[in-house]
Regions:
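Conserved Class I S-adenosyl-L-methionine
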Residues: 3-7, 209-259
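Class I SAM-dependent methyltransferase Rossmann-like catalytic core
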Residues: 1-57, 62-64
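C-terminal alpha-helical "lid/dimerization" subdomain adjacent to the S-adenosyl-L-methionine
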Residues: 167-227
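A short, conserved alpha-helix within the catalytic core of class I
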Residues: 135-150
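Hydrophobic adenine-recognition pocket in adenosine-nucleotide-binding enzymes
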Residues: 131
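A conserved beta-strand element that flanks and buttresses the S-adenosyl-L-methionine
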Residues: 126-128
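Conserved beta-strand signature within the Rossmann-like core of class I S-adenosyl-L-methionine
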Residues: 147-163
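Class I SAM-dependent methyltransferase SAM/SAH-binding core
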Residues: 53-120
Length: 259
């Protein structure tokens, strides 16, 4: 079933203007709802355990929850946590906006970065937010294997529950959120207004991708099973679910080199 489904934003030919507007919406939604707030303590713990202050965020989209996560981490950290945003299709305008807002904390890679083959010079805790469901089991194994080969700790986080209520919520509420909040999304784009209100391609594709995303979600034990297949007992793994303020489950898989 997974192989038969696709998400528009994964397609190489999909227009950047539409893709970036979709991920800009996701960043706004994740920030306003504090979607990933419950996993910040996990990230803080693994940073301290591995003595890292750098986060290499993979599959960043438009930045996802980076502002919320960074704020939470720096509130409890003794040092200044730094985040490098990366993506296969980097959203340069959004990354620049975030970098200008947090010049001492956020940087980005302007070239395409494959989560399965991260450059060795990008050192730190690797994170993936709302992205792992885009990959099949083989690709997830390659992502984890690459982290292990580079002795990099990794945290994978994905939100939502695989049920009909989640799908109905996406169908009913996301179009309304687009209608109400699109003028507040940054960076401002005229094209975003056109393809939201006049020709609603952005909301349509976002809702379609959201529905497919729900059907593709992985259970935490599934992710941990994939991880252990690629790990020769070199890493400590922890997986599970925590509820956020919306009452939705956030799945997590965290791995770090054994000390």
């Amino acid at each position: 079933m997974r192989k038969l489904l696709f998400e528009f934003e994964d397609l190489s030919w999909f227009p950047d203007t539409i893709r970036e507007s979709m991920t800009d919406y996701l960043r706004y939604f994740l920030k306003v709802t504090k979607f990933y707030k419950p996993v910040i303590p996990f990230i803080s713990e693994i940073l301290k355990q591995t003595n890292h202050q750098n986060i290499i965020d993979l599959c960043s989209g438009s930045g996802g929850p980076v502002e919320e996560v960074l704020s939470g981490l720096n509130a409890t950290s003794e040092g200044n946590i730094k985040v490098t945003l990366t993506d296969k299709f980097p959203n340069i305008s959004s990354y620049t906006l975030l970098q200008n807002k947090y010049p001492k904390s956020i940087s980005f890679e302007s070239t395409s970065i494959d989560a399965k083959n991260v450059p060795e010079e990008l050192k730190g805790l690797r994170t993936i937010f709302s992205g792992i469901h885009h990959f099949d089991e083989v690709s997830i194994g390659e992502i984890i294997h690459n982290a292990i080969q580079n002795n990099a700790p990794i945290g994978i986080f994905d939100g939502g529950d695989r049920n009909i209520f989640m799908i109905l919520g996406i169908i009913l509420f996301h179009p309304l959120l687009f209608f109400l909040f699109t003028p507040f999304f940054r960076p401002f784009r005229i094209s975003r207004l056109i393809f939201t209100y006049l020709i609603p391609i952005i909301p349509f594709c976002t809702v379609c991708d959201g529905i497919v995303s729900i059907t593709r979600l992985y259970a935490p034990e599934h992710l941990e099973r994939i991880a252990r297949v690629h790990d020769e007992a070199r890493y400590t793994w922890k997986s599970g679910k925590v509820k956020n303020s919306l009452g939705m489950n956030v799945t997590y898989l965290i791995g770090s080199p054994k000390r």
